[in-house]
Amino acid sequence: MTILNRFCRTILLTNLELTNCGIRKNNSYKCRSFTHTINIDTNHIVPIHTQSNITLELFQPKISVVGVGGGGGNAVNHMISQSLEGVEFFVCNTDSQDLIKSNSINKIQLGPQLTKGHGAGANPEKGRLAAEESKNKIIQTFKDTDLLFLAAGMGGGTGTGSSPIIAKTIKEFKKETIIVGVVTVPFNFEGKRKEIIAKKGLEELSKYVDTLVVISNQNLLDASKSDIQLEQAFLMVDEILHTGIRSIANIINVPGMINLDYSDVVNILKNRKGLSRIGFGEASGEDRAYKAVHKAIKNPLIEIDDQKFTGLLVNISGGNDITLNEISKTINYLQQNADPDVQVFVGHTVDNSLLGKIRISCLFVH
């Protein structure tokens, strides 16, 4: 029986409730707040229903998602359609027609004087100048945000040129804001010019975000069926962006057996250098925990073989049929496959739409 398993069962036997464990360096654990416990007969996770006369003031971070440019706007539309809870959505674009079509109610037209609403014409410099023109609007919109996810497609004009200025502007106004860039880089068929523009955009954006997660469209295409339609390919990209942002937001917002403090999430996201990757895995049936975590860390999208990662943020999602033993197995597997110096933080969220399944997401950060 693992340390975590023994520890949890000891807590149960003394009628204490467990919800919050974070794996720390050297395999030490810490626990804090309590909202779920284990049904000893079934070994399943169940919510705790308690009454208390104590009034607590809880810090609820404001989480925002902003889609910049056409690609970022499409990603936000997809997230809104999937009912991602606990976050507020925004779109920023130079193209007024794209803004009109957006499902988000919070819209910023970038550089209206410069572009007259006609877009940046695939020119990152015009995108940069448009964002510079709209700095005051950007500050006013995001001044109260604590955690910002910035979604964009690299290789065009607005997403590539405006995103770094948006991130820089917010950081200069409120340095405590944690900014996570979640961006895509082009398919090979989009040409060398877009590839070069995207690379320069990544370099510039990485200066101003805390964590930069990069998703390769080409890797996604290579890992999918060869006859996939273009529309399906871009929808898959939007779903990857959605899943990545949801996994981090849910660790903070959704109750579960293991709820990380916001400070833990900040610790692993803040001031990271280099490009980060995210992997996902979902499985059902026998050995579903092992299968899901194996898929997540061996995901072809994340390209981690030649990179040194210093942190790993993991979200384990499942219905109330998920067992403590499955969570323990997942944590053990991650420990065995991670460098001893890597900080590993694990959160668990309950999602009863996943009854019979386990979904695991892993954010690898520098």
Curated annotation (Swiss-Prot):
Upper classification of the source organism reads:
Eukaryota, Amoebozoa, Evosea, Eumycetozoa, Dictyostelia
Query: Which GO biological-process labels does this protein carry?
Result: cell division; mitochondrion organization; negative regulation of mitochondrial fission; negative regulation of mitochondrial fusion; organelle fission
This chain's protein is named Mitochondrial division protein fszB
Any stretches that span the bilayer, and where are they? none
| Organism, as annotated | Dictyostelium discoideum (Social amoeba)
User: Where is this protein chiefly located?
Assistant: mitochondrion
Q: Which GO terms describe its molecular function?
A: GTP binding; GTPase activity
Which InterPro entries does the UniProt entry name for this protein?
Answer: Cell_div_FtsZ (IPR000158), Cell_div_FtsZ_CS (IPR020805), FtsZ/CetZ (IPR045061), FtsZ_C (IPR024757), Tub_FtsZ_C (IPR008280), Tubulin/FtsZ_2-layer-sand-dom (IPR018316), Tubulin/FtsZ_GTPase_sf (IPR036525), Tubulin_FtsZ_GTPase (IPR003008)
Q: Tell where it localizes.
A: Mitochondrion
Question: Has UniProt tagged this entry with the keyword Oxidoreductase?
Answer: no
Q: Which GO terms describe its cellular component?
A: cell division site; cytoplasm; mitochondrial matrix
